[in-house]
Amino acid sequence: MVRHPVSRPVDVLHLGRDRVICAYEIDGVIVDPGPASCVETLIDRLGPVEPRVLLLTHIHLDHAGATGVLCRRYPKLKVYVHEVGAPHLVDPSKLLKSAGRLYGDAMWELWGEVAPVPEERITTLSGGE
């Protein structure tokens, strides 16, 4: 019998509220870790699971904002993201400028530190991968 991994939802309690932002964990792969403002909750709720891979569906801060902080915390963590989003992970300045115009003074509370991701940690995906 073939065993298929089962995804586990991990509610990161954005702004202390449940069912707002949810990451998913599948055998140490974290799909969309959420914002950096929730990284401690994510880590606590993962329990003994140490993330080995982040798989990002896209780079919006509610899905991928914690990526740089998690890479700093877990030195072997690998990141998979579409090729269009990868440059914004390496240098998030344009993303932060755009988000700052939208969220203003609430930026830090909503999203936390958006840290750059070392380029060598990123594997880009394209097309239908």
What are these language model-derived features?
Residues 1-49:
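Conserved beta-strand hairpin/beta-sheet module of binuclear metal-dependent hydrolase folds
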Residues 11, 80, 122-125:
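General small-molecule cofactor/ligand-binding pocket signal
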Residues 14-16, 83, 126:
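Residues at the C-termini of beta-strands that transition into short coil/loop
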Residues 33-35, 59, 84-85, 128-129:
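Active-site metal-binding loops of divalent metal-dependent hydrolases
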Residues 37, 61-62, 87, 94:
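Short alpha-helical
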Residues 40-81:
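Active-site metal-binding motif and surrounding structural segment of the metallo-beta-lactamase
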Residues 80-87, 92:
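A short, structured active-site edge motif that brings together acidic residues
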Residues 89-129:
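Metallo-beta-lactamase
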